[in-house]
């Protein structure tokens, strides 16, 4: 167990990540500081069970907490009351049609208990690049032509690493998550990494896994066949009431 996080040099040196098991206990999961946000670095992080999380003015901070928060793609919990409300919903759901708008909304939507956003300008550009390379994806919820909710993350092999979701209308982020999960389950992607627990995620069915178990699954799933680089056609357009 290390008492200090590792220091990573920036590109082009590309210092490799240390094993995720070397992350600190306090703060839980902090593994490394520094490096960069190139696609190569980000993909190496996700493949190792590591993710970036820092705010404006900080160097890149890299995390792998224990326990890890995970969804089974076939086990998203929507309450009976919420499901009933969907029966009359006219909202529509698509994928990879407004990635930039989703990440911008995730950055700007106010969140209880948070004064700012961890989605910095550099972070935004990094994930836009990953999207252009076919690794980062979004699911979007529309009320007419208005984007009212969404979620984005990174897909590698048959593993999905969730990053953030937002909602400007009550329940829209739940619809985005449930629609994403249904799509992933249909295409043999069994897990969604949700990173760090909170009560909202636990209420939706997230589980707390020992990091060693999470890493075992990640190492296996990332080697499996990738989904298409763009999901829009494969996903199609769905009605939110189809989730009932």
Swiss-Prot record:
Enzyme class, spelled out: transferase
Enzyme nomenclature, EC number: 2.3.2.6
Renumbered residue ranges of the record's region Disordered: 1-22
Pfam family, one: Leu_Phe_trans
Highest taxon of source: Bacteria
GO cellular component: cytoplasm
Keywords in alphabetical order: Acyltransferase, Cytoplasm, Transferase
Name of the featured protein: Leucyl/phenylalanyl-tRNA--protein transferase
Example GO molecular function: leucyl-tRNA--protein transferase activity
Family statement drawn from the similarity comment of this UniProt entry: Belongs to the L/F-transferase family.
Free-text function comment from the UniProt entry: Functions in the N-end rule pathway of protein degradation where it conjugates Leu, Phe and, less efficiently, Met from aminoacyl-tRNAs to the N-termini of proteins containing an N-terminal arginine or lysine.
Localisation per UniProt entry: Cytoplasm
Reactions listed under catalytic activity: N-terminal L-lysyl-[protein] + L-leucyl-tRNA(Leu) = N-terminal L-leucyl-L-lysyl-[protein] + tRNA(Leu) + H(+); N-terminal L-arginyl-[protein] + L-leucyl-tRNA(Leu) = N-terminal L-leucyl-L-arginyl-[protein] + tRNA(Leu) + H(+); L-phenylalanyl-tRNA(Phe) + an N-terminal L-alpha-aminoacyl-[protein] = an N-terminal L-phenylalanyl-L-alpha-aminoacyl-[protein] + tRNA(Phe)
Transferase keyword on record: yes
InterPro entries per record: Acyl_CoA_acyltransferase, Leu/Phe-tRNA_Trfase, Leu/Phe-tRNA_Trfase_C, Leu/Phe-tRNA_Trfase_N
Gene: aat
Coiled coil ranges: none
SUPFAM superfamilies recorded: Acyl-CoA N-acyltransferases (Nat)
GO biological process, one term: protein catabolic process
UniProt key word Acyltransferase: yes
């Amino acid at each position: 167990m290390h008492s200090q996080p590792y220091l990573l040099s920036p590109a082009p040196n590309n210092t490799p990540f240390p094993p995720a098991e070397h992350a600190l206990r306090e703060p839980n999961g902090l593994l490394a500081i520094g490096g960069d946000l190139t696609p190569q670095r980000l993909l190496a992080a996700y493949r190792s069970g590591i993710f970036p999380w820092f705010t404006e003015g900080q160097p890149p901070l890299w995390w792998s907490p224990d326990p890890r928060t995970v969804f089974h793609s076939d086990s998203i919990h929507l309450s009976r009351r919420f499901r009933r409300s969907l029966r009359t919903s006219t909202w529509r759901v698509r994928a990879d049609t407004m990635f930039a708008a989703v990440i911008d909304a995730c950055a700007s939507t106010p969140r209880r208990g948070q004064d700012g956003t961890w989605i910095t300008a550099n972070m935004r550009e990094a994930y836009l690049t990953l999207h252009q390379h076919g690794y980062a994806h979004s699911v979007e919820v529309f009320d007419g032509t208005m984007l009212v909710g969404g979620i984005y993350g990174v897909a590698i092999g048959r593993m999905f690493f969730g990053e953030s979701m937002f909602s400007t209308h009550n329940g829209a982020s739940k619809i985005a998550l449930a629609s994403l999960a249904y799509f992933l389950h249909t295409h043999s992607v069994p897990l969604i990494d949700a990173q760090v627990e909170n009560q909202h995620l636990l209420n939706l069915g997230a589980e707390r896994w020992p990091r060693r178990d999470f890493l075992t699954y990640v190492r296996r799933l990332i080697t499996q066949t990738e989904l298409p680089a763009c999901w829009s056609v494969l996903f199609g357009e769905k009605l939110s009431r189809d989730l009932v």
